[in-house]
Amino acid sequence: MTEHSRDTPQFYLTAPSPCPYLPGKEERKVFTHLVGERAGALNDVLTQGGFRRSQSIAYRPACEGCRACISVRICVDDFVPSRSFRRTLKENEDLIGALRPPSPTSEQYGLFRSYVTSRHGSGGMADMSVLDYAMMVEDTHVQTRLVEYRRRGPDSRINGRGTGDLFAVALTDILGDGLSMVYSFYNPNIPERSLGTFLILDHIAKAKEMGMPYVYLGYWVNGSRKMDYKRRFLPQERLSPHGWERVDE
């Protein structure tokens, strides 16, 4: 292997497979491996170009005749929570999200199983074993953290950690210009808390505290109901063939 081939990422194209978002469509992906000392820098550049990370792979859609998957990132500095978002923040003000190393636990996996069974019982994640979950968390060569959400305790202001049961978890990459929410899951039995929305709102707050301009949400899929929630977080930027374009309403 030459010096050039080691330093230059190699990209590959998957075979067509059924689209998980739009019935009757097929998807293809272009992907590369995120390994070695330059994995973090490469992940930054690729995320800014519309890629997503899954374990040690960065990928983006490359579907023939379809451009429904659009990369979305929230503009942190200009974000103002709506009335419904403020209600969600109020409902969850007793929770705190603690950043931890990407180390899986049986408690996390139990919550993950409850979430997947409730929300994605027939999806590809339904069959994930505890070892599969551990790989999803640990197989990273970039700056990744787990954000664990628990109730605030008497020492939370000092140590930044909560106490008691685990309510939610977010697998998050720390990029040069923001936070990328790789995957999140939460207790599905307390819908009144709107925990999925709260996790995004809390990541916006965390990014602002860290001086980062963006929270990357992955793909908004035009025509997919389960991805439609991403449109609610405004202002945001969406990646087009002409670059990132701001959307305010």
Swiss-Prot record:
One of its GO terms (molecular function) is arginyl-tRNA--protein transferase activity. It is an enzyme of class 2 (transferase). It catalyses: N-terminal L-glutamyl-[protein] + L-leucyl-tRNA(Leu) = N-terminal L-leucyl-L-glutamyl-[protein] + tRNA(Leu) + H(+); N-terminal L-aspartyl-[protein] + L-leucyl-tRNA(Leu) = N-terminal L-leucyl-L-aspartyl-[protein] + tRNA(Leu) + H(+). Keywords: Acyltransferase, Cytoplasm, Transferase. Its main location: cytoplasm. It is found in: Cytoplasm. Disulfide bonds: none annotated. One of its GO terms (biological process) is ubiquitin-dependent protein catabolic process via the N-end rule pathway. The keyword Transcription does not apply. Its EC number is 2.3.2.29. It comes from the Bacteria. InterPro entries: Acyl_CoA_acyltransferase, Asp_Glu_LeuTrfase, N-end_Aminoacyl_Trfase, N-end_Aminoacyl_Trfase_C, N-end_Aminoacyl_Trfase_N. One of its GO terms (cellular component) is cytoplasm. Belongs to the R-transferase family. Bpt subfamily. Functions in the N-end rule pathway of protein degradation where it conjugates Leu from its aminoacyl-tRNA to the N-termini of proteins containing an N-terminal aspartate or glutamate. PANTHER family: ARGININE-TRNA-PROTEIN TRANSFERASE 1, ARGINYL-TRNA--PROTEIN TRANSFERASE 1. This is Aspartate/glutamate leucyltransferase. The lineage of its organism: Bacteria, Pseudomonadati, Pseudomonadota, Alphaproteobacteria, Hyphomicrobiales. The gene is bpt.
